[in-house]
From Swiss-Prot:
Subcellular localization, as worded in the UniProt entry: Cell membrane
GO cellular component: plasma membrane
Membrane-side (Extracellular) residue stretches: 34-344
Protein name: Histidine protein kinase SLN1
Comp. bias regions, Polar residues: 717-745, 903-914, 1123-1140
First-level EC class: transferase
GO biological process: cell wall organization; cellular response to farnesol; filamentous growth of a population of unicellular organisms in response to biotic stimulus; filamentous growth of a unicellular organism; osmosensory signaling via phosphorelay pathway; phosphorelay signal transduction system; positive regulation of filamentous growth of a population of unicellular organisms in response to biotic stimulus
Region called Disordered, residue ranges: 387-440, 675-777, 841-933, 1080-1230
Amino acid sequence: MRRLKIGIRPQLIIIVCFASLFSLLILGIVTGIYFSANLKNLRLERLLVISQLKRTQVQQAIQYIAYQVMTVSEVDSLTVPLSNYRAGNNSKAVFSEAQNYLQQYVLTTDSFTAARLYDLDLQVVASSFDNMTLISESAQDVVYPLQPNRSMPPVLGTPSGLYFTGPIANNSDNFNSRYFMGITVPVLSNSSIILSQPSISGYLTIVAAAESIRSALNSTSEDDYQAMAVQPVYGDPQKGIDNLSQNAYNGDNEVIGFKLVFPVENSLLEAGTIYNINSSSSMKTALASNSGTATGVKSFFGKKVAIGFSRISVQDNLNWSIVIVQSNSVFNGPANKLRKITIGVVIGIGAFMCFVTFPLAVWFIRPITKLKEATEAITKYKKEKLNSVNSNSPTSGSGSGSGSGSGSRANSDSSADQSLSLDTGKRNSINSSSFSSSYSTGIRLPARIPRSKKIFKDELTELSEAFNIMTEELDKQYTHLEDRVKLRTKELEASKIQAEAANEAKTVFIANISHELRTPLNGILGMTSIAMEEEDPNVIHDSLKLIHRSGELLLHILTELLTYSKNTLNRSKLEKSNFQILEIVYQVRSIFNKLAHDQRVNFKILVKPNIFRKLIIYGDSNRIIQIVMNLVSNSLKFTPVDGSVSVSFKLLGEYDHERSKKLDYKKVCILNDSSSSTVAVPPPTPPSDTKPNPKPKSTPTPKPDPTRSHLVDHNNRSANTTSPLTPVRKPTNQTKNKSITNNVTKQNMKIRKKKKTNKNLHNNNNNNKNDNSDFLMNRRLSGSHKFNNTNDEELSPTAIEKNIDKYLTSSADSDNISVTTLSTVQYETTIFESQFKSKPLPALPVDAKPQVSGKIDENDVNDEDPSGGSIKDDDSEDTINEKQGISSSPSSSSSSNEKQENSPRSNDSTTVTVTRPRHNMMPSAQDFKSYPTFDKKPEYDSNMSNNEIVKNNRVYRIRNMYQPKVWVIQIEVTDTGPGIEPALQEKVFEPFVQGDQTLSRSYGGTGLGLSICRQLATMMHGTLTLKSTIGKGSTFTLTLPLPQTGEIMVPPEDMAEFCEDEFNPAAKINRKVAFEDGDIDTESQQQENPSSEEDTQGDRNVQSSTSSSPPNSSSTDSALPASDSSDIGGTNKSKTTSHGNNKNINAKKRIITNSSASSTKGTKRHTNNDGGGGVNGNHSDDNKDLTLTIDKPSLFTRGSTGTANSGTTSSHSDKKILYPTPTTTTTTTTTTDHTTVLDDISHLRVLVAEDNSVNQEVISRMLKQEGITNLTMACNGAKAIDFVKESIENNENFDLIFMDVQMPEVDGLKATKMIRKNLQYNKPIIALTAFADESNVKECLNSGMSGFITKPISKTNIKKVLVEFLSNEVVTS
C-alpha cells in the first residue's frame, strides 16, 4: 500500500502552530499555578508577620505594665509596713505610708486607675483609686482576684508569680467604653536579718487601663484585614466550661470555646461572649498551635477566610492568640488578576505564531529539500556502482585469497544493497523497507513508537527506530526508578508506622510517668503536712519513714530516666575488674532474700557447674549485678504468693569471638558449636556433683564417670577433664588423690540414725517461725560491714574494726531502704563502698609456688606482725588467727591474752580464720546494703596482692592466667508469674514499653528497666532474651562473654568442700536432715561443714528446712515441711534481749553460737571461760563447750535460721540464746572498758564546706546525732581554705572535712588541692557530690580527697565514713 505523501512544509506549519500553542498553554498553566501559589504564600507570610508584629506590640505593652507593677511591689513604702505587720505591729498607722504612696502613684500616672494592698489573710490594708476614672462594680469583681471568700491562684504562691485578670469593659453596652485589666503580684520582704531569702508578706493588685493594648490591635485598613485578640476557653466537652480554668491552661481539659478580648469594628462578634470552638474552623485552627497561617478556613459566619495567628506567652493565665483575618476574595485578588493576564498573553502569542509560521516554513524547508536531493543522488550513484561491481565479480568462490576476499565483500555489499531501492518516479521519497521496523514520530511519546499506519511518509520516518531504542532505554530507567520509588514508599510507610507506634508508646509513657512522679511527691507533701501537725513522736517517725521511702522512689524513677539517656548517648563506660561469680551470687541473695520472704515467694539461686566457682573473671561486676537485680526485682514484683523465682548461673563454654563478630555480636557464639544458638554443652561435671548437668539435645556429650570425678588431680592435666584451664608450669610433685567415699558412707549412716530423733523436735519449732522479734531485730541492725577475727586486748586495728562493727549495728541506724528503690540504691551503694576496698590481682611471681594447701600446721606459724595477728609462712605474709588459739595480741605473746576456740573438725586438718586488711577483702553479701540483717563476717576473705583466697577457713592460692581464655556465662532468671504476651516479648526491651501499657495497670515503673539492661548487655557484647508463656511464667536469659584472668587452685580432695554451699543443688546443706551435736563425731562434722553464707566458722552441720524460714530459701524446697534444730522462739527472744546489751559488749572478738547447730535440742554448748587456750590449745570434744565466731549478717531464711550471740549455756528448758556480756565473755580479758571505739567522738573537730543551707542543716544534724558537736560551717571553698589555715595556725586542726564539689568562688576540687598542697593538710577530706558517677568519683579522689558521699546524704554512709576515717583519731585521743 502506497502512502500518501504530504510535504514537510505543511507538516512543519501544522507542527509549529500546534507546538507553539501547546507550549504556551503549558507555560501559562505552570507559570500561573506557580506564581499564584508563591503569591498566596507571600500573602500568608504577610498575615503571619502582621500577627507577630501585633503580638509583639501587645506583649510589650503587657510586660511594660507588669514591669511597673513589679517595681511598685518592691518599694520600701510597701514592703516595710507589711514586714512590720507580719512581725506583730497591728496598728492602723503602720500602713499610712503605703496608703499615701499608692494614692500618689495612681494620681500621677495615666496608665493606672486603682490599687489595693493585701496582707497574707487577703485583707485590704491599703487602697487607692483615681477619682476621674470610676470602675464599675462588675469590672471590680473581675480585676480584683483576691478576696477572702475566693481561693488564691496557685501562681501567686511563688515569689516570682504574676497573675493577670481582665481586660474587661467598664460598660459592656458601650463599644467605645474603656477597658481595664488587673495585675496581681506577691510582695516580698525580709522580716528577719537571720533569713537570707525574702518571703511573701502580702499581695499587690493594680488596675491598669488596657487602651495601649487595644490600640496595638487596631488595623490601618479595615477593608484589608481585621486584627483580633482571642482567648481560649477550657473545659470538659461533656460537662461544659470550667469557670475556674478559663484563664489558665489545665492539662485535663481541652479548648471548647473562644471569646474576643476586645471588640472589633465591623464584626458581629461581641467581646466577652463565649462561642463554641466548633462553630469557627478558623478560630479552632488558630488556637490549636502557637503560630502559623491557614487558608480556606471558615469564619464564625461561614465565610471562607485566610488567617495568620501568633500566641502571646507572658504567663500561664495570659494565653491570648492574635488572629489576623482576611476575607477570601481580598486574599485571592492578586492571584485572580495574574491568572487573567496569563490567559490573555497565551492567546495573543498563539495568534501571532500562526501568522508568522507560513513564510518561515517556506524559508526553512529549502535546506531540507536540498539535503534530500543530494542524498538521493548519492544513493543512486552508490547503487549503480554496486551493480557494476557485482557484474564484474567471479561467480566461483575458488581462486586466490584476494579474489575470495573481493567476492565476499561483493556479496556482502550486494546483499546490503538489496535492502535499499530508489523510487525514481516520485519526489521526496525514500524507501526504508530494509529496517525491521519503522515508527511514526508524529507525536513524541515516552514509550516505544509503533510502526506508523499513516497513508503517507516523510523524512523523519527513518529516525523512528533510533528514537525507539532511546525510548526503550528510558523505559528501563523509568521502570527502575519507579521500583525504587515504590521501595522508598514502603520504607517510608514502615517508618511512619514505627513512628506512630513510638509516639503512642511515648503518649502512654507520659501518662504513666506522670502518675509515677506524682505518687512519691504526693507521699512526700502529704506526710510532711501530716507530720507538721502531729505531736506524737511515733507518728512523726512513721511519717518521716514514708517521706524517706517516697523520696527514694522518686530518686529511683529519675535515675532510670537519666541512665537510659546516658546509655543512649553512649556516655556510659564499663568499670572492669577481677571478681568471682560468688560475689555476685551472695549480693543477689543478700538483697532479695528478705524481699522474697516478705512476699512469700520461693527464691532459689544455683551455680553450675561447680568448677565455675574456681574462675577469676574480668568484667564490670557492678553492671552485671545491676542487670540481675533488675530482672530479679521484676520477677519478684510479678510473681504471686507461693510462687517461685530462681536464678541460675551457668558456664556454657569457650567464647567464639570470630563468629560473634560476624553476627555483629547479635548472638554469643561458643567454640565447637556448629549451631548459631547460644546454648552449648556445659563443661563436664566437677568432683562434687552427684549427677551430671543437663545438656542440650542438639549436642550430646558423654556422661562423666562420677566415681572418677573426685579423683582428678589438678596437677595432672592429662587426667583432669573438669578444669577449663591450662597449666602455668609443671609442678614438682603430684598431689596424692584421695577419695571421700568412706567418709560420705559413714555420714549417711549417721544421717539415717538421727533422722527419727530430730523429727518431733523440728515439728515443735514450726509454731514459732513468724515471731516478730527477729524481724524487728533485723530492721534495727545493719548488714553491710566487715569483721575480723582477733583476740586483741588493746585497741589494735583489728580491735578497732570490731568496735566499728558494734557502732554500725547500733539501734540508731534506721536508714532502711525502700523495696521499690532497691536496684538504684544498691548500685549507688556499690559505687560508694568501692572507696573502702580494692581488688588488685597482680601477676604471680615467677619463683612463687602454686601452693593450694588449705592446711596450716602449727610449725608454720611464726612471730606475729604488729598489725594485728599477722604471721608469715614460706611464701607470703598472711594475717591468720588459728582456731586452736593462736595469739593475736600485738604487744604480748603470753597465753593469758590468747583465746582457745574449740573446733569440731578432725585433727588432720587445722582450721584457721584469716583476717585481712579491710581494703583487701573480697566483697560479699554484707558489703552491699539491702535489708538490715545480723552482722556476720564475709564468706570469702581474699588477699589479691598475695594471690590467695580463704573459704571455710581454708587457704587457696590463686593462679594467674598468662593466656586468658574468654568464657560464655549465662544467667537465667525464671519466675512463675503471669507471663508476657508473645506480641510484647520483644517490645518490652524497647524504651517506655511495659508488659501492661494501660493506665489501670497494677504495677508502676517507667518502662526503662529492661531497655537499660539490654543496653548494658549490648555494651558487654552480650545478649538479653526472654521466653515467656502466659499463665506459666517468664525466663530472662543474660549471656555474656567474660575473660578469665585467674584460677583458684583447689586440690581434688578439697573440691567437694570448696563447692559445699547452698547454691550447689547437690550440696550437703541442701539435704533434708538434721543432727544433734551430742551424737556427731568430729569426722562427720568435718564432712558436713557447708560453706553457705549463713553458716558460721565453727560447728556447721547440715540442716533441714528451718521452722522460721520462708518459702524463698535458695537451699531448700518449699514444698517440704519446715523444720529446724534450733528453737526459734528462744532465738527470737535472745535477739531482742541481746540487742539491748549490744552497746555493752566489750570491744573484743564476738563469739556466737550457730543457730542451725548450737541450739539443737538436748545439746548444751558452754562458752570456754577458762582462759587457758594457747598456741597448742586442746581440741574439745563434741559434747564439750563450743564457741563459734559469727560470720556475717544472717538472713532470716530457710536453710539458715538467725544466728544469735551466745555467752551462756544454750538450755533446752528455757530456750534462750544470749549475747555475751562482760561477765560471760569467752575471752580472758583484764580490761573493763565496755564502750565502743566511737562512743565518744564529741571532742573531734569537723569542718563542713557546703553552700546550700538545707544541706548544711541536714549534715550538721546527722553529725550531731552521731555525737559530733564541734562543727564549723563554710559556705564556699574560699571560706573552707581560710578556716583550715586558721586552725593550723592555732594548732587546732580539723579531724575531718566534708567538702562539697560544686560551690561558689572556689569549688571543692580546687579547694582540696589548695588545702593539700599549700596547707599540707593530711587529715581525711570527704567529698559531697550529687553526681554519683564513676568519672566524678575518680576526679574527686585524684584531687586529693580521701572518700566521697553521694547526695542525698544517708546516715548509713555518714556512719561508714566516720568509722573508716575517724577510727585512728579516736584511738589516738
